[in-house]
A protein has these predicted regions:
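Metal-dependent phosphodiesterase/phospholipase catalytic core, i.e.
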Residues: 10-123, 138-141, 145-151, 161-163
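C-terminal active-site rim and adjoining tail of enzyme catalytic domains
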Residues: 43-46, 121-206
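Residue-level recognition of short loop/turn positions
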Residues: 2-3, 193
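Hydrophobic "anchor" residues
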Residues: 6-8
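Homeobox/homeodomain signature
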Residues: 4, 14-25, 90, 130-133, ...
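Conserved metal-phosphate-binding beta-hairpin within the catalytic cores
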Residues: 1-2, 69
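Short catalytic/ligand-binding loop motif for oxyanion handling, primarily in non-cytosolic enzymes
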Residues: 3, 76-78, 178
Length: 206
């Protein structure tokens, strides 16, 4: 935020999912806190407000929830973002409970150099010409491909797992593709419908 708070939000600006306008980097936390970020989705979510990163970490620590945190720093630059995220995680001793990802692979390289104890993942949504060479040069722990890329290039599973990397795929919202990703051996499925995913995973495991 303008006053240096780390907040949880999907977009760089607030228009799409709130009753406000403007970029988060140009707004103070108090200004953001005045926004309703739930009503756009459904009246039952009206009155929801933006959380700080610290609030989310505290919730995850209390509930023992594993957290996949995406840094949204590929469109807007946020100074010292990596170190500030690391500081918040480490002061709560949650290095093994959080893994961090981004489409900004340079940021993830820097993050891993600053803190080898926190797992990092590289998000991507387009094929690479020479992925084998790319992962050889990477210090990331995980790969986060869009699920269709694993269907288009099934050999990627063997490549990533052969390098000791976890494969966490996104965003899988329908049952057939959930089953397909499980069958391919992915380590994690990111979905907008966790209730459906849990049911599918239970059915497959049974």
């Amino acid at each position: 935020t303008k006053d240096g708070k780390l907040v949880i939000f999907h977009d760089a600006s607030v228009e799409r999912t709130s009753n406000g306008t403007g970029f988060i980097k140009d707004m103070t936390y108090d200004e953001l806190l005045s926004l309703d970020i739930g009503a756009w989705k459904s009246p039952e979510f009206a009155g929801q407000h933006i959380w700080t990163f610290g609030q989310l970490l505290d919730f995850c620590k209390e509930t023992k929830m594993l957290l996949n945190m995406e840094l949204k720093n590929y469109e807007v630059f946020y100074e010292n973002l990596e170190q500030r995220v690391i500081d918040e995680i480490c002061k709560r001793q949650m290095q093994e409970q959080v893994f961090v990802s981004s489409f900004n692979h340079i940021s993830m390289q820097h993050f891993k150099e600053l803190c080898p104890d926190i797992e990092t993942g590289l998000l991507y949504d387009k094929p690479y010409l020479d992925m084998e060479h790319y992962v050889q040069r990477s210090n990331a722990d995980n790969m986060h491909p869009r699920y269709m890329l694993l269907q288009y290039q099934p050999e990627l599973m063997e490549l990533f797992h052969g390098r000791g990397m976890k494969v966490n795929t996104w965003t899988v919202n329908d049952e057939e593709n959930m089953k397909d990703m499980i069958a391919r051996g992915v380590d994690c499925i990111i979905s907008n419908h966790p209730d459906v995913l849990c049911r599918v995973a239970d059915d497959v495991c049974d």
